[in-house]
Amino acid sequence: MPNNVKLLFFIFLLLCGGAPQKASSQSLHGIKGLPPYERAVLIIKHYEGWHTKKDYPYIGYGHQIQPGENLRYPITETQADSLLRSDLTKLCAMFRKYEADSLLLACIAYNCGPARLLGDGKRTPKSRLLRKLDQGNRDIFAECLTFCRYKGRPIPSIRRRRWVEFHLLFNPCL
């Protein structure tokens, strides 16, 4: 029950205009008043947290350092924000064919990796979530919640993250 209270408190803060300090320096009028992309950025910042040298190869808000990238610890919040937005934009482009659902899919992929959704053509098949969307079925809440495992075990905090992403980014009216 305490975890549910924390989640409700977090959502209350976001809806009422309070956001974690590190997540945004601007004054918010509630997360629902923000454009969906900005909501996604705040959700990712909140759940990824700040990655330091001990989290290598991740830096900032969960950017995975790629071969050839000249990134050194520590980085500024501005650099981390820029990396997050660049990564999220690339993921949105990857899921562009899913139109209104591309941002939600990009958020899941930011956390799990795009291969978990798209499949890798070898061992990992295309996800049931994408197969449903391909069939025109947008009843995907349960499928979104399945992306909550780490090393095969369900993780409650990741499940809460999926719940928040779905409720703040999914538009059922489309």
Regions found by a protein language model. Name each.
Residues 1-7:
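Positively charged n-region of N-terminal signal peptides that target proteins for export
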Residues 7-16:
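Sec-dependent N-terminal signal peptides
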Residues 21-51, 63-67, 75-94, 115-174:
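Long, amphipathic alpha-helical surface segments
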Residues 52-56, 95-104, 143:
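Surface-exposed patches in mature extracellular/periplasmic domains of secreted proteins
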Residues 55-59, 63:
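Early exported N-terminus immediately downstream of N-terminal targeting peptides
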Residues 102-116:
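Short N-proximal segments of mature Sec-exported proteins
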